[in-house]
Amino acid sequence: MTQLRIQATFVVDVWDGVDDEKVDGGPVTARVELAKTYTEGDVLGTATGHMATTQGPGGAAYVAQERVTGTVGGRTGTFVLEHRATQVGSGEPVTWAGIVPGSGTGELAGISGEGSLGHGTLDLTVELP
C-alpha cells in the first residue's frame, strides 16, 4: 500500500437546495443536489452528490456523499467521498471527510482514507494499493 497526503481545491458548480417541511420552533432542514469541479492539487476532476442540512439558532450540521470522477495522484478512476460538519452556535465547525470503503474504481480501486473538507478545500490522507 502507498500512503499519500492529498490536498485539492474545488469550486461548487451546482447547489440546488429544497427546504423540507417547516416545524414551528424547529431548525430548517433541507436536501441539496450538488456538483463540484476539483481544479487544483492532487485531485483533478468532477463530483456530483447529495447533502442533507440542518440550520437553527443553536447550530448547524450537514452530511453529504459525492462521487468523484477524475485523477488522484495521477491515477484515474472514481470513488465516493462522504463528509460532514457540525457547528455549535457561532463557533468553528468540526469537519470530517472519508472515502467510502470499497467505492474506488479503475486505478483507484482499493483507495481508502480520511481527513477534512473545508470551504473549497479537501485534505485527506489516503492509501492506494
Regions found by a protein language model. Give the residues of each.
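Beta-strand-enriched cores of mature, soluble protein domains
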Residues: 1-129
